[in-house]
């Protein structure tokens, strides 16, 4: 019976009776994600593309390992003994002071309001970077056309979650089992957006079998534009909320950010063939006419003017339990 190898970067099935000392090619280190770059601590190679990261060939040879790594130990939460209500009451005389009535908040507009494209401000650094890329791509265009149809032996499939490599013409007839969604890392959990099997262990995440069947994608030309995750964060001042998306060399003519008072839809094309999508149901209300987007060579900043000067508890409006159930049913 074939067993699954849990060595990092392998994920292959093997026969335990034919497990030689050099049968497995794997990474002894750990995955490193820093400033949008992804790689392994044991290797020097870094990439911004998650599929390229998954296809980085291991740097060490050894025996296959069928032992599943233990789940990270969760901290034990200790609770104190319950105290009587009388013990929790303050020992001094209470004086209740009635606070003044708060200023009436702005009524939340309907999310069905028409969407408006936010103004795009393009920095000089981005213009210079795009001009350089156009010159270099023009010089290499002929060479790319010659090499585009050639698939080298050992080329990894570009579909997410597929660890197969090209071994010849027979590989063109194989069925590819892959993940059609994008990888999501949130609050220590790792999963694919298409099947939502969550795990806290990165090795287990890499070994998750795909949920979709189709054909292998051996070249980026066949893959077309690929939806990829981007590192992003947000901050706020008294009157503005700013979202920063760390995508290099974004293309203004193909990118779009649209919004209404409570919704934000982000679509960014960057580095020629990568796409980033994000739909945000905003916690507060914004003034669309006074909001704009600044595009630089290294990131995109979405500046939204608050409709009222108040502190937002978070960027996104929390979903209700009813909405979560409806979303799970839809998935």
From Swiss-Prot:
Signal peptide: none annotated. Zn(2+) 4 binds at residues 179, 194-195, 211. GO terms for molecular function: ADP binding; ATP binding; Hsp90 protein binding; zinc ion binding. The modification Phosphoserine is found at residue 51. Zn(2+) 3 binds at residues 157, 162, 176, 216. Residues 64-82 have a biased composition (Basic and acidic residues). Zn(2+) 2 binds at residues 27, 42-43, 59. Keywords: Acetylation, Chaperone, Metal-binding, Phosphoprotein, Repeat, Stress response, Zinc. Residues 5-64, 157-216 form the CHORD domain. The keyword Transit peptide does not apply. The keyword Repeat applies. Residues 227-316 form the CS domain. Residues 62-82 are annotated as: Disordered. Residues 2-77 are annotated as: Interaction with PPP5C. Regulates centrosome duplication, probably by inhibiting the kinase activity of ROCK2. Proposed to act as co-chaperone for HSP90. May play a role in the regulation of NOD1 via a HSP90 chaperone complex. In vitro, has intrinsic chaperone activity. This function may be achieved by inhibiting association of ROCK2 with NPM1. Plays a role in ensuring the localization of the tyrosine kinase receptor EGFR to the plasma membrane, and thus ensures the subsequent regulation of EGFR activity and EGF-induced actin cytoskeleton remodeling. Involved in stress response. Prevents tumorigenesis. Interacts with HSP90AA1, HSP90AB1, PPP5C, ROCK1 and ROCK2. This is Cysteine and histidine-rich domain-containing protein 1. It comes from Rattus norvegicus (Rat).
